[in-house]
Every structure is written in structure tokens, then in C-alpha cells.
Amino acid sequence: MNSELFSPYTIKDVTLKNRIVMSPMCMYSSENEDGQVTNFHLIHYGTRAAGQVGLVMIEATAVLPEGRISNKDLGIWDDSLIEGLHKTTTFIHDNGAKAAIQLAHAGRKAELETDALAPSAVPFNETMKIPVEMSIQQIKNTILAFQQAAVRSKQAGFDVIEIHGAHGYLINEFLSPLSNKRTDEYGGSPEKRYRFLREIIDSINEVWNGPLFVRISANDYHPDGLTVQDYVQYTKWMKEQGVDLIDCSSGAVVPARIDVYPGYQVQYAKHIKEHANIATGAVGLITTGAQAEQILTNNEADLIFIGRELLRNPYFPRIAANELGFELEEPYQYERAPGKISTNK
């Protein structure tokens, strides 16, 4: 039986064997607080690759030490961090998947002893520290850090880079009027709020020619915040800059009540795909093969990002293939265990 979910997908010179992407999820497992990959990361990501995920995306990886969400985040701010990341990509590749990395800066959501940096001195909520408004020089230094991280990503063997522009972290903070109150060239109009991300994309394009994704929060869930229609314009600009795919999440720039249900963010992937004419990834409570297949068949997205379901079962692709009646090629090490895998939870 043919399946959209298990059809290959090519972006530039990178071909994914299927449309399943492991969504980036922080593991907070750099136990020595130095940003280094640990044995846990090798097992965690390698298992999903062996489970037949098409693209394994490494969690949010900090471009600067002060840009970590926690002191146990992975990092890519120094050349000494390349070796561990390279071991991870090698392990992923050896198990038949492609490897991606999400480059990130936590901004005002950095829960460290050092000052949190943000476009404006506006805290996320009443319990978090008031961030320091970034100077122009700090902005330039951060843009350079993203570029240097892209260089290290190439040296570490990653096939795809994703820029983390969502979930209330630094880039999202610049994009949203709820968190960006600047009156200089990095704040005010949509064009000026976009400038920080524009310059990050330009700087990465100088050193990286592989597939480039951007994760967005397509809805601020606030009457004075951004909506998916605002992101149509942002993503049109991203496409003009050469971004290949928009990973469509939502929320978390301010505290908000979100109506969560299966596939609740697919609407954003569909809207951006249709109105910005750019490839998209759907993410958010996609938990079955049939659900993923329908999203692709309906042309609502191009890739399916799976998060919690892959935490529950690293062999989700095999379960989805069984569900869809698709014969998935097994790793040779597992050939003595053919047949259907139970979908019981």
C-alpha cells in the first residue's frame, strides 16, 4: 500500500526517507552543566533513528551559554562542543536517518544565575526575573553567535538547521509586540521587529547552504499579540531569504490559556502553506499514523513533527506503518522480529 507518510521528501540536496520528524524537545541532560552531549543523548536520539524516523532533530541547542533555558541544556557556543554533537549525528546516520539541530537562545526565559537578556525589560510573568534590555552590541554579538553555531553545525555533520523562533524565546520575543517595546531599528513596526531574525537568517546563509527551517509560534493567544495572519507576512519574508520550511507551533510568548486537542496546530501549518506558499511542518498532539497520513493527503503540511508520541514509543514509525498497511523496511538487526507491533497503549 502506498503512503504519503512513508514517501521520501527532498529539500535541496537532502532526501528524507519518510515525512516523520522527531520534534525538538529539551532533555535537560547535560549533567555537568557544560553544554556537552552525554551518553543519554546518544541513546535517546539513536533509538529514534533506529525506530525509522526520517529526520531526527536535536533539542534546542544554545548558541551562547547565557542563552540556555537551564544550565543542563545542550550547547554549541564553543568548538569543544562539536565532538559530542558529531558522535550524535554519526549515530543517527548509521541508523538510516538524517540529522537536524535546532539553534536557540532562551532570551528572557533563561533560568540561570546570570542576567536574562531580551529585546525589552519586560518579564514573562510576575514570578520570573526582569530581563535586561539588549544593547545594539549585544544584538550583533548574538547574531554572530547564531552564525558561528551554523558553522559548527556543519562541522558536526548535521543535514538540516532549524532556527528556534517560537515559544517565547529570544527571537519570538523580538517578533511579538507583547515582548518587544523597543523604539529603535529593532522594534516598532513589523519590519523592524523582524529585523533581528532577518539578520540571523542572512548571517546563517553566509556559511550554510543546506536546508534551513524556522520554528514559529503562529498565534500569541492574546488580543494584542500576533496571529497566524501576521505570520503570513513574516513567513513570506523568510521565504524570500531562502528559508525552506516553516515548523508551525504556537503560544508561550506570554502566559495564555490554550485550547489543546489532537492536531490543534495543524490549522497554522495549512494556513501558512496556502498563503505564504512555503513548505510547512505540522506539530502538536499528532499521535497516530492515520492522523499524520490525513494531514499530508489533505495537503495541510509537508512534514509531520512528532514529539510526545516519540517519547512514549521510539518505534512509532513502525506502529504507524502497521496501522496504514505499509511495509516498512526493518533495520537488519531487527529482522528476526517481523510482523505487527501492538498499538495498545
Curated annotation (Swiss-Prot):
Coiled-coil zones: none
Reactions that this protein is recorded to catalyse: A + NADPH + H(+) = AH2 + NADP(+)
Any one GO biological process: response to toxic substance
Binding site for substrate: 28, 164-167
The enzyme's E.C. designation: 1.6.99.1
Uppermost EC category: oxidoreductase
Keywords from the named record: Detoxification, Flavoprotein, FMN, NADP, Oxidoreductase
InterPro entries, alphabetized: Aldolase_TIM (IPR013785), NADPH_DH_bac (IPR023663), OxRdtase_FMN_N (IPR001155), YqjM-like (IPR044152)
A Pfam family: Oxidored_FMN
Residue intervals passing through the bilayer: none
Subunit structure: Homotetramer.
Family: Belongs to the NADH:flavin oxidoreductase/NADH oxidase family. NamA subfamily.
Protein name from the UniProt record: NADPH dehydrogenase
Organism of origin: Bacillus thuringiensis (strain Al Hakam)
